[in-house]
Structure formats: structure tokens, C-alpha cells
Amino acid sequence: MPVSDGRGLDRFIAFPYDHYRDDPLWVPQLRRDMRTLLTPGKNPFFEHAEAQYWTARRADGRTVGRIGAIKNDMHNKEHNDRVGFYGFFESIDDQAVANALFDTAAAWLRTKGFDTMRGPMSPSVNDECGLLIANNGTPPSLMMPYNFPYYQALHERYGFAKAKDLLAFDGGGAQMAPERFVRLAQRAGERRGIKLRTLDMKRFDAEVELIKALYNSAWEKNWGLCR
């Protein structure tokens, strides 16, 4: 069923809370944050993008899956392709349910002129993206995807093929950076005239533009980047 009102969006947001309720590793996102992420007018992403969301429901009304289809105009302008995206995918371990969700998203993307569907992107490469296919028994990290192991099979049986390996590195949060690395960083900064300073709130807009420029420069060779 397409999400067409606030009640439908509430159901879309609520499904993972039921889906993962017995998984001790799952860390829920705040519902308020999810609503902001999904809503045009609240998320600046939708200044250059469009999305449609659906939930899958049994005859008894029980929700068994969800998906979103995303049209990212900035991506297609920058990369000159016809790639549409899907994201926010969740499903019970039932291939028929997953297929129906994938088919629905693909059909919507075809109406927008796309010939390729890529994901999960929730909703973009700057947010949660990719599918967890290894180390499912470890706690999830911030902005990293988390899903049941059977999701890989649902995708492969549908016919998806890998577009890119996405890697997450565990730095051991309780560990301090090795002293040698700290010394090297300090020397490099001194040689290049780099200084660390606090944010100047009196020049907030200029500081935001500077951070944006630094971010884009650091990530310009990252796969799928949209500036």
C-alpha cells in the first residue's frame, strides 16, 4: 500500500520496531528523526529529490514489509546516468513479500524514466546505504546499515547484483589513537600550516560554507558522491 498520509507514514516508521523487537542488537532510530528524514519540507535532500513509500500488509492487516523508491536529480545530473534508488527496505523472510516490494519500487522508478535500480540508499549515499552481509552478530554503528542475514538471499534471489563493496571499520571506541599517529598528525599540521580551532558562531554562515567545501573536497572521489 502506498504511503499517502500521516497515518501511513506512522505505520511505515513503526514497522522496524515490530520487525526487530526480539533482536537484542538492533538500535532503533528515534521516530521523530525518521519522520524528519522521510518528509519533504523537513529534509533538505528533497529540494532535489522525490520519493514514494509503500508498506506490505497481509489480509489481516499485519504489516510485513516496507520500501521506498527515490528519484535523486542531483545524482543523475552529476553522474549522467538513469539510476533510480530504493531504500528503507525491510521484510519478513518471505521471498514473495520481498519481490512484491522490489517490483513496486521498480515500477515507480520506470515511470520516472530510470533503467537501473540501485540500493539500499536510505535515502542517499550520504545517509545509511548498502546491505549488511557480514558480521551480523556485532552491534550496529552510527549511520551503518543493520539487517537480518537473510536479506542478502532476498536480494540475490530477486536478481540484484553487487554494485560496490562498502566497508565499515571498527576502530575500537574505547581505545585512544596511538601516540605515534598523534605526533605524525601534529607534524603534518605544522608543516602545512594547519591549525585546529573552535567554530566561530559569529560567522556561522561562512563557517558552514567552509565546512561544506572541506567535506566535498575530502569526499570528492568517494563512490556515488553528489555535491
Set out the residue ranges of the language-model regions.
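Short low-complexity, flexible loop/linker segments enriched in glycine and/or proline
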Residues: L37, L132-N135, P178-R180
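Acyl-donor binding region in acyl/amide transferases
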Residues: N76-K164, N222-L225
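Conserved beta-hairpin
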Residues: E50-I67, E156-Y158, K162-D165
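A short acidic/small-residue loop/turn micro-motif
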Residues: K71-D73
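A short helix-loop-beta-strand connector motif used in the catalytic cores of GNAT acetyltransferases and
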Residues: T39-T55
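Acyltransferase donor/substrate-recognition loop-hinge adjacent to the catalytic core
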Residues: P145-G224
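Short amphipathic alpha-helix that is part of the acyltransferase structural core
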Residues: M1-G41, R82-F85, E190-R227
